[in-house]
Structure formats: structure tokens, C-alpha cells
Amino acid sequence: MFKRKDWLIIVIALLLALGLFVLTRSGIQFGLPGDNDPMRVLTEINPPANADTIQEPVQAYLVLNVGNTRYKPLPLTREAIYRLHQSDGRDNVIHVTRDSVYMESANCDNQDCIKQGMVDFVNRDARVLSNMIICLPNQVVLELMTPEEAGVNAQ
């Protein structure tokens, strides 16, 4: 009925299917090089109807890490609230201003990321976590950086 090669093909197909299943369930995010725009995973809550027309130099950047993915620095040009919703239901709400960031809410159990408070350029050297806010259960790390630290030219 089935020859040796048929069984080999069936076993290989099953192993490939099992491997893909494990990869999709592991939470590892895959993307194309250059596909690390933070606005791909962030949704602004109540964006303003009209954007500011005054172009001031960017003083701060938010670097977002979700799981194993590090996103490009997001310039902080105005006050905004962003929602980070992951496909497995993990949610974080991030509040940013031109020079600060804090975790407004999260659906993690311990809420340590919210208790870490605001990071700005005045307090970041005195904080235990320096310029970072970390949500371990949701695998989210927020970093407040200067343009030089973020590796971008000051605008």
C-alpha cells in the first residue's frame, strides 16, 4: 500500500507541521528586516484632530522592545497615549510627553510596571532601572533615550 518513500514524505510533512505549530505558539515575532516601525504595534488613543504645525527639535525618543523584537526609536514630539495590544491578549497603555514616559495601565498580574512610575531626563539617573520601564509578564521594555543614545541625528 504505502512504500518507504511515501512514509518518509508523510513523516517529514508531519514534522514540518509540528514545527510550525510550535513556532506560532511560542510567541516569537518574526518580521522582515526594516519591519520594525513601532507604529505597527502601537495604536494612539484619542489622537488630536489637527497635528501641531510647529516643528521643534526632538528631545527624546521612546525605544520599544516587545518580546525579542526591538523597534525603531519613536520620536516624542507631543503628549500622547498609546495602546500596545499583543495577539495573545496582553495589553499595555503607554503615556508619553515630549520628555517623559510612563506605563499608564497593563493587564499583567503584578502591576510592577505601573509602580515604576515616570521616567524623564531629570530622574532617570537616580532610578533603579535608569531609563527603563519593564513589564516582565507582558515582555515589554520601554526606554527613554536622547537622540544621541537612540542613534538618530538631532532634528
Regions inferred by a protein language model and the residue ranges of each:
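Extracytoplasmic/periplasm-facing segments of secreted or lipoprotein envelope proteins
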Residues: Y61-D91, R98
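Short, Lys/Arg-rich N-terminal segment immediately upstream of the first membrane anchor
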Residues: M1-R4
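N-terminal post-signal-peptidase region of extra-cytosolic proteins
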Residues: E79-I81, C113-R124
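Glycine- and acidic-residue-biased ligand/ion/polar-headgroup-sensing regions
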Residues: A60, G89-N110, N138
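Hydrophobic membrane-insertion alpha-helices, especially the h-region
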Residues: L8-R25
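Short extracytoplasmic/periplasmic juxtamembrane "stem" segments immediately C-terminal to an N-terminal membrane anchor
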Residues: G34-L64
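Aromatic-capped interface at the extracytoplasmic side
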Residues: V22-N36
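C-terminal partner/receptor-binding element of secreted or periplasmic proteins
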Residues: D125-Q155
